[in-house]
Swiss-Prot record:
Positions annotated to bind L-glutamine: 46-48, 107, 138-139
Function: Catalyzes the hydrolysis of glutamine to glutamate and ammonia as part of the biosynthesis of pyridoxal 5'-phosphate. The resulting ammonia molecule is channeled to the active site of PdxS.
Superkingdom assignment: Bacteria
E.C. number(s) listed in UniProt: 4.3.3.6, 3.5.1.2
Protein name according to UniProt: Pyridoxal 5'-phosphate synthase subunit PdxT
Record keyword Hydrolase present: yes
Family named by the database record: Belongs to the glutaminase PdxT/SNO family.
Pfam families reported for this sequence: SNO
Keywords, ordered alphabetically: Glutamine amidotransferase, Hydrolase, Lyase, Pyridoxal phosphate
Example of a GO cellular component annotation carried by this entry: cytosol
Species: Corynebacterium glutamicum (strain ATCC 13032 / DSM 20300 / JCM 1318 / BCRC 11384 / CCUG 27702 / LMG 3730 / NBRC 12168 / NCIMB 10025 / NRRL B-2784 / 534)
Amino acid sequence: MIVGVLALQGGVEEHLTALEALGATTRKVRVPKDLDGLEGIVIPGGESTVLDKLARTFDVVEPLANLIRDGLPVFATCAGLIYLAKHLDNPARGQQTLAVVDVVVRRNAFGAQRESFDTTVDVSFDGATFPGVQASFIRAPIVTAFGPTVEAIAALNGGEVVGVRQGNIIALSFHPEETGDYRIHQAWLDLVRKHAELAI
């Protein structure tokens, strides 16, 4: 089983470290041919506007969006959540997204870099609960609205939705890969394996 990490910018190495620690075979994805044969892909955090521009530069937008629409499992963190969203509350000028997850997302919902913080978050999906996931929020977004096919899987004490699931897509506002808490990576890899088995 090969899983990719979209390696255009951001926290690429941290996700590769997490996935490889869990026994996954990984591949960096920069151009369309890198998508061939993948059974899942991670879209890391970083800067969502830069991610958008580089994805267009490397012509990876349409092939990636098509694979996701066809059911490719995705794990996205922070800017990755923004990049998947159908709508943004506060897009940068000219900013585009893959528009594959039926959510409205607010960028930088907690303020600038100096307002970044670490906390713990309970995450629940597929009948499993992962209590106290160690989470870094770095210029993090929140989900302000979501459609009927989307499930909220994580929220802060104030009610802010910081994790969603839509089908084979898990998207978080925060960075578990930065903290060494790989439980959500493992749960996503389990989802990838189930999807691969169903495809046989």
